[in-house]
């Protein structure tokens, strides 16, 4: 009866339950889109969640590792984070102040300072080269005083707002022909130590402390996406007496094992020596890691303080002519990036972070990415998640998308960052209190590598995928999972063996991944203080729990992401306020997308374009027609459509439903992506 009432109310409001199917190659019409760029200036209280941060950053002492997690003197700490890439790390002082304030409003409490050591430009994509932290004097060694001053002022602003930093050291200096050689090249090793010393021991005039002694630093990464076990197989790192990768399988087992040990020792010695240098010579106290786990074998990382990983759903093929696979991860019944990369490479006993993650623009479904990651990161008990990237350019306040990975102007994604912060940082999504720990001894990893030599991080996923079902995708989606590198394989026989099904729900009952209708997947989060739907409604009523239900009308993609966050954390029936966000099709003004065809001339789900068809700001978006049923009394509930700054723009009528409960009907007529709800 409840569903019948909901359908009736929605139809009386003039809604449509027919979802427009996103067929292969379809590019929706821009008709009805409106400009909406979330403000870079002052914002209204309704969209300011900076109270989730504990300012100033570092007031409770240095972050350290205890019992496999990050803690400070106050207790456990999670890093709800983003990245700044390349010249975006060097804003003017005025821009730095606005940037720090804006990030804090979205509940971001850490920023990864990434790719500062090389001009980010034509080597990556056809845009003008911008400054790095090194002076343009040909030395590639001297820090640029102006860029260093800008960076240090930015860090001071972050600290004041309660935002920590992750210092990413070697990324792209000398570009990629040196990748991997730092494991055995003394000259490169010396330059890495020199850069670390210059950057970490310089006294910041705005904080009075060098980074090595400043608790604003949360963690330090030695290298980005760089490991001997990967670069050897890519062909750009090989000593004259080493076999070629193609020759490995032909060698006797003893020689293969000896070569594995050679690579393992070279790499682990380098990481351990750099960690010791930072600790003993520079006085660094915070956790240190080497590189991402997907780039090497776990035995090479044993000496590090925590583990880190990266993942992208449908990473674009970049160039003047680019291509993007335009598919929604919610339609992958196998778990997408979560089970394919992130969960099976989480090793037990140490903190785990994901310092880069994105569903890159112009994916029409990009808004699903961060909510799905943050919900599962909270459930899995991870220690940090970093949206990649806040910005990649020196234009710190873009009005549109300037690159595939930036979030600063990506309205459809950014508006849900508040729900992400509530789920992960505030802990509104509960962690699995028990979890499972499949055993995968380091010796097993080595033995599998000998039979099928490949880049290091792929070995763990290979073993996970060939298990007997006790380390299956379903296990990882239903239970907190951490691979025990020192465990007894006999333990694996006692783990639950999950059976396949179209609906996967976490053991806590708060997260549901539903593929009952193929091609119309749904991802739902049901907690007392955060409700989330992302996917293809297909005319269904979404019961989000605690008296909250959602019905979505016709959208341009037949798809939407909707989040509802309680500001006070007291639920949606009690006195207080909440933020409702509903997003859909969003892209640059005047963007031109081309539908790709396969070799047989059939349309595919890939979209592509040329850089000069990329379009410009402002971001154009659609308003989502939906009916939201709340547990609060209609007589005590008010709702307002908000403008780009979060200020009240127009009141939304609240209707009285069954038992006097509140019913909201939102839609494109309000020309907004977010709404404030108040219960008195």
Annotated model-derived regions:
Residues 56-304:
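Active-site mouth of glycoside hydrolases
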Residues 4-13:
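Sec-dependent N-terminal signal peptides
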Residues 421-422, 430-634, 638-641:
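Long, low-hydrophobicity ectodomains and other hydrophilic envelope-associated domains
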Residues 20-59:
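N-terminal pre-domain segments of enzymes
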Residues 15-19:
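Sec/Tat signal peptide C-region and signal peptidase I cleavage site
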Residues 270-287, 296-314, 326-480, 485:
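Catalytic-core region of carbohydrate-active enzymes that cleave or remodel glycosidic bonds
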């Amino acid at each position: 009866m409840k569903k019948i009432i909901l359908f009736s109310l929605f139809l009386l409001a003039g809604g449509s339950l027919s979802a427009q199917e996103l067929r292969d190659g379809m590019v929706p019409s821009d008709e009805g889109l409106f400009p909406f760029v979330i403000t870079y200036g002052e914002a209204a209280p309704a969209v300011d969640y900076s109270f989730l941060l504990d300012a100033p950053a570092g007031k409770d002492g240095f972050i350290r590792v205890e019992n496999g997690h990050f803690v400070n003197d106050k207790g456990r700490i999670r890093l709800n984070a983003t990245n700044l890439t390349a010249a975006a790390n060097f804003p003017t002082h005025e821009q730095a102040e606005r940037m720090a304030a804006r990030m804090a409003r979205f509940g971001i409490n850490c920023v990864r300072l990434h790719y500062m050591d090389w001009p980010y430009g034509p080597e990556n994509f056809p845009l003008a080269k911008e400054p790095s932290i090194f002076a343009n004097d040909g030395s590639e060694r001297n820090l640029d005083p102006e860029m260093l001053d800008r960076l240090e002022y930015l860090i001071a602003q972050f600290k004041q707002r309660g935002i920590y930093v992750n210092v990413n050291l070697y990324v792209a200096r000398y570009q990629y022909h040196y990748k991997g050689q730092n494991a055995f090249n003394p000259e490169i090793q010396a330059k890495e130590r020199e850069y670390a010393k210059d950057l970490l021991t310089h006294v910041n005039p705005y904080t009075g402390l060098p980074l090595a002694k400043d608790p604003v630093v949360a963690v330090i990464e030695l290298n980005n996406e760089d490991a001997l076990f990967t670069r050897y197989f890519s062909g750009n790192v090989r000593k004259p007496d080493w076999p070629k990768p193609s020759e490995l399988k032909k060698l006797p087992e003893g020689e293969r094992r000896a070569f594995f040990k050679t690579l393992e020792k070279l790499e682990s010695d380098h990481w351990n020596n750099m960690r010791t240098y930072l600790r003993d010579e520079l006085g660094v106290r915070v956790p240190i890691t080497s590189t991402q786990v997907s780039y090497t074998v776990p035995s090479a990382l044993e000496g590090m303080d925590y583990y880190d990983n990266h993942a992208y759903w449908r990473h674009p093929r970049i160039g003047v002519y680019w291509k993007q696979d335009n598919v929604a991860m919610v339609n992958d019944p196998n778990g997408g990036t979560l089970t394919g990369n992130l969960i099976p490479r989480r090793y037990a006993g140490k903190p785990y972070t994901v310092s880069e993650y994105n569903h890159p623009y112009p994916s029409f479904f990009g808004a699903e990415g961060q909510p799905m990651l943050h919900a599962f990161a909270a459930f899995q008990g991870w220690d940090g998640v970093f949206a990649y990237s806040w910005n990649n350019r020196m234009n710190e306040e873009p009005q549109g998308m300037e690159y595939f990975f930036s979030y600063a102007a990506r309205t459809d994604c950014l508006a849900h960052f508040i729900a992400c912060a509530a789920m992960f940082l505030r802990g509104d999504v509960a962690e699995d209190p028990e979890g499972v720990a499949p055993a995968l001894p380091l010796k097993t990893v080595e033995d599998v590598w000998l039979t099928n030599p490949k880049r290091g991080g792929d070995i763990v996923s290979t073993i996970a995928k060939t298990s007997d079902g006790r380390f299956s995708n379903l296990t990882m989606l239903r239970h907190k999972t951490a691979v025990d590198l020192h465990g007894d394989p006999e333990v694996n026989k006692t783990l639950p063996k999950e059976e396949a099904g179209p609906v996967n729900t976490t053991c806590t009952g708060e997260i549901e991944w539903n593929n009952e209708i193929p091609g119309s997947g749904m991802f739902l989060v049901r907690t007392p203080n955060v409700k989330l739907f992302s996917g293809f409604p297909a005319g269904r009523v979404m019961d989000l729990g605690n008296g909250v239900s959602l019905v979505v009308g016709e959208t341009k993609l037949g798809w939407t992401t909707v989040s509802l966050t309680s500001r006070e954390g007291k639920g949606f029936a009690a006195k207080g306020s909440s933020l409702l966000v509903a997003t859909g099709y969003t892209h640059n003004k005047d963007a031109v997308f081309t539908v790709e065809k396969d070799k047989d001339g059939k349309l595919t789900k890939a979209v592509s374009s040329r850089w000069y068809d990329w379009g410009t700001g402002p971001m154009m978006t659609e308003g989502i027609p939906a009916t939201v049923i709340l547990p609060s009394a209609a007589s005590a509930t008010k709702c307002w459509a908000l403008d780009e700054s979060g200020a009240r723009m127009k009141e939304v009528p609240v209707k009285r439903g069954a038992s006097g409960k509140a019913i909201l009907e939102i839609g494109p007529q309000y020309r907004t992506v977010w709404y404030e709800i108040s219960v008195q």
